[in-house]
Amino acid sequence: MTTTTATPRGFGYRHPQFRLAGLLAAPMAWLVVVYLGSLFALFLTAFWTVDDFTGQLVRTFTLKNFQQVFTNTAYLSTVVRTVSIALLVTLFALVLALPLAFFMARVASPRWRPLLVALVLTPLWASYLVKVYAWRAMLQPENGVISWFLQPFGLSGPGYGFVGIVVTLTYLWLPYMVLPIYAGLTRLPNSMLDASADLGASGGRTFRSVVMPIIFPSIVAGSVFTFSLSLGDYITAQIVGGKITMLGNVVQTTYVTNLPFAAAVATIPVVIVLLYLLAVRRSGALDNL
């Protein structure tokens, strides 16, 4: 005859929800204190000002900084320019990513797909500054690689400026658009494409009516990355932008002498991204991601 001894079960075993809370306590504390805390400090500082005589912070509520941004033509044009660059980068990244991701997911053989994914990821392993300075060498107005290649045709490269920023940022963030679309295309059943062809739909009609609705959440996910990363970038504009500046450059040049104004400028990309995420959430584009 055998006897069994009851194993005592602790409080955490009887209440798994408390075990889950214990596991999440540390990362949630980090998120609240470091991430949300820094955002709160940023928003709070944006409503302060600086004494013109002493240069000290004046901790009184004011909208002066935001009024200066949206009433000063130079700052307002910088806001419009930054948003335009982010939109163009997202658009060009999408145009390049769609055929590339489609080839990787639907045309290339399964044995080559891991290699193609690795090739897309390879630029992310290189230093950000190395990649930007490489594009600086290519975009040089006189001795750059692009100008050297176009000279026999009587053309010249874009040089430094608006176009250089868009081209460089598109290269930097392209993998963030390719990978979500590739993941979405791998989930596309072959039976749906076959059914569309059997019903007499052309390739373009199949792409518009079958493929696009399925990969649209993936496109939105990729656009969140490319749009938000472009909005907050300032190093690329500093290296290949010439005289063109973005919001990040304004923050960089003003935070030492006027921290509240720099904080107000820094809140603009944050608010724009939050509004974009809210619109995406309300549209339900990410529900099936």
Question: Model-derived features: where do they sit?
Answer:
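Interhelical loop and adjacent transmembrane-helix boundary motif
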Residues: T4-R9, R14-R19, D51, L63-A74, ...
